[in-house]
Swiss-Prot record:
Pfam families: SelO. Its cofactor is Mg(2+); Mn(2+). This is Protein nucleotidyltransferase YdiU. Belongs to the SELO family.
Length: 485
């Protein structure tokens, strides 16, 4: 059944079903996906609707009812075909050819008001041919965590998928890493693309360069449209993907975010952050911080993220080399570190209050900041928030005024580094007039919100839901994240 034949598709009174759904990926043919059926749930309770995304889809939040979300994204009425995408991937360094959408599917693709194509992908919508013995479901806690991660990262300026909605579905689930039975949910993830590095790796595994080229042409036409008419569009695509991924991981690092599971099947071909599992925001600066309890050797620890993303880009060259020149891809990848460092330095300087500094000043300040954070083990997010909260023009007068009203207390042995940092910050401020001091205060406030999505915050929010069915802390936390308070 094609989209045009979908029952009630164009004439539906449900605004979410009346969107201008496109069949860009479906038109590639069934070498890339399987048609699947959605699970039927005993209950549908709308727990989250992301009204901030609706105007981008040309919808008025006041017009779209809660029941519309449930009908479209909980009961999946009026939408066919539903497509489970096929892909493989390197998981913790080992190739896995048994992957694919195991608990979700591509619900549809929508051209937004900005002209960009967005994918609606489900999570927790039931079994598919790739469920590998799993139930295809999503725990309610898993849904809550993904909503929070996506909103937090988006409002920190990280390029990320967003959660359009989350619906509790009334099924008891059994999990080894949660008290069970636990509650269930289904969610809709709005992302720039459902296609992963692993989508190409699967085609290479089956030795289908024809399908690889067809998919790559599709990716460029839909997500790198500015390159579609270029003679060297393939190598230009790879070069831009390198830049996007390098900048993305720099955004994670500056935000203190650890993705936890950077397998190639969790890497988006558009260079967007998505697929949030056991992620965590670091409590203190520790390059060895591990977010996933099953990452026994720390492969995906916080400090390894840049090198792992670079490695994944290098492994992507294998399926692409049937179309792209290997040497040209290597030349593009060599710029990864340059892109990463430029983005990371820019973001960290903004967290320190500066839109720009001379290279010697910037390098010295960043190096000393990281050294202090590492040795002192003060709260990573607390340090930057305290800078924003206590910043004063008096910091320019004497080094002793810098951070003197903050709650930052270095551990014994780190006070000397902290003194050096205060002296350097004071010295840099001496070069700024009063107008530029005001800009520093504004920059600090914008880039260092009070609310940090640390694990105790998430667990406290979940405890209220699990024990009392109290959702107020969840909504208040999202409000704080969105308002950057």
């Amino acid at each position: 059944m094609t989209l045009a034949e979908t029952p009630n598709y164009k004439n539906s009174s449900n605004p979410l079903l009346s969107l201008n759904y496109e069949s860009a990926l479906e038109s590639l043919g069934d070498d890339y996906y399987d048609e699947v059926a959605a699970a039927e749930f005993p209950q549908h309770i709308l727990r989250w609707r992301n009204d901030a995304l609706l105007p981008r889809l040309g919808l008025d939040p006041q017009v779209v009812k809660d029941e519309d979300f449930i009908t479209a994204f909980g009961q999946f009425q009026g939408r066919k075909p539903l497509l489970a995408l096929r892909y493989h991937g390197y998981q913790f360094g080992e190739y896995n050819g048994q992957l694919g959408d195991g608990r979700g599917f591509l619900y549809g693709q929508v051209r937004a008001t900005d002209g960009e194509l967005y994918d609606f992908g489900t999570k927790g919508s039931g079994r598919t041919p790739y469920s590998r013995g799993g139930d295809g479901m999503l725990t309610l806690k898993g849904g809550v965590r993904e909503v929070l991660a996506a909103e937090a990262l988006h409002h920190l300026g990280v390029r990320t998928s967003r959660c359009l909605t989350m619906i509790e579905t009334g099924l008891p689930l059994w999990r080894g890493d949660e008290p069970s039975p636990t509650r269930s949910s289904v969610m809709i993830r709005m992302s720039s693309s459902h296609i992963r590095f692993g989508t190409f790796e699967r085609l290479h595994y089956f030795q289908r360069p024809d399908l690889t080229k067809k998919l790559l042409d599709h990716v460029i036409e839909q997500y790198y449209r500015h390159l579609s008419s270029e003679q060297d569009k393939y190598v230009l695509f790879y070069a831009e993907l390198v830049k996007r991924v390098a900048e993305l991981v720099a955004q994670w690092m500056a935000a203190g975010f650890c993705h936890a599971v950077l397998n190639t099947d969790n890497m988006s071909i558009t260079g967007e952050s998505f697929d949030y599992g056991p992620y965590a925001f670091i409590p203190t600066y520790n390059p060895s911080f591990i977010a996933a309890y099953f990452d026994y050797y720390g492969r995906y620890c916080y400090g390894n993220q840049p090198s792992i993303c670079k490695l994944n880009l290098q492994m992507l060259q294998e399926p692409l080399k049937a179309i792209l020149d290997k040497d040209e891809m290597e030349a593009a990848l060599e710029r990864f570190d340059e892109y990463y460092q430029a983005e990371y330095s820019s973001l960290m300087l903004k967290r320190l209050g500066f839109v720009e500094l001379s290279y010697p000043q910037a390098a010295e300040l960043l190096n000393l900041t990281v050294e202090f954070l590492k040795d002192s083990q003060v709260g990573y997010h607390q340090f930057f928030y305290e800078m924003a909260r206590t910043f004063s023009s008096k910091w320019r007068d004497e080094p002793g005024f810098v951070m003197n009203n903050s709650d930052i207390v270095p551990v014994p042995g780190a006070s000397g580094i902290f003194d050096d940092w205060c002296i350097l910050y004071h010295k840099i401020l001496n070069d700024f007039d009063s107008d530029r001091i005001d800009v520093i205060a504004q920059t600090l406030a914008v880039h260092n919100p009070k609310t940090a999505l640390l694990r105790p915050v998430i667990e406290s929010t979940w405890k209220a839901i699990a024990q009392e069915d109290n959702w107020q802390p969840f909504y208040e936390l999202i409000q704080a994240i969105q308002s950057r308070k």
